[in-house]
């Protein structure tokens, strides 16, 4: 009787560990196949950088599976090189150019096996601070532009 109980407990715990590893593994490999993964792994814990990761969230009415962001004050050249490597694989590219230089952009990367769209959004350093965002979910380029670039501007009347 004790052996049966121990066997059931062992099977239960093994199954539980397997399920947990499946869930964690899906988010841990979110950027699999993208160069941007290197930015988060290399600079995520560096001095002058702030990294935030959120999973399965709603942002402005859009369901996001993975939202990962890194702001940095250093490493601009290194990070720009890594973003450029992903730019070459991008399916769609939207950029904001000012005075002939790319200020920010949104790269639509190839989707995941589950059909989730993947995006790399970036801003090049202005006053020394830049940002890189990885977004994964059933959202479109237009949704990402609304999420990341929506400005809270009030109309002013000029008299």
Model features per residue range: what roles?
Residues 108-141:
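A short, solvent-exposed beta-edge/loop patch
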Residues 30-90:
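N-terminal secretory signal peptides
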Residues 61-67, 102-104, 116-119, 128-130:
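Short, surface-exposed beta-edge/turn micro-motifs
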Residues 72-117:
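Mid-chain, structured segments of secreted extracytoplasmic proteins
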Residues 129-159:
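C-terminal partner/receptor-binding element of secreted or periplasmic proteins
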Residues 36-43, 72-73, 110, 149-159:
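Terminal interaction module
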Residues 56, 101-107, 145-146, 155-159:
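Low-complexity, flexible helical/coil segments
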Residues 1-36:
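Bacterial Sec-dependent N-terminal signal peptides
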């Amino acid at each position: 009787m004790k052996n049966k109980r121990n066997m059931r407990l062992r099977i239960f715990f093994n199954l539980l560990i397997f399920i947990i590893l499946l869930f964690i593994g899906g988010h841990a490999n979110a950027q699999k196949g993208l160069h941007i993964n290197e930015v988060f792994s290399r600079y995520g814990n560096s001095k002058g950088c702030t990294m935030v990761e959120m999973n399965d969230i709603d942002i402005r009415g859009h369901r996001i599976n993975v939202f990962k962001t890194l702001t940095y004050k250093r490493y601009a050249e290194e990070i720009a090189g890594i973003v450029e490597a992903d730019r070459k694989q991008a399916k769609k590219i939207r950029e904001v150019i000012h005075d002939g230089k790319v200020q920010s952009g949104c790269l639509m990367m190839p989707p995941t096996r589950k059909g989730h769209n993947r995006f790399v959004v970036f801003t090049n350093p202005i006053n020394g601070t830049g940002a890189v965002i990885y977004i994964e979910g059933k959202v479109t380029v237009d949704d990402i532009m609304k999420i990341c670039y929506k400005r809270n501007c009030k109309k002013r009347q000029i008299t």
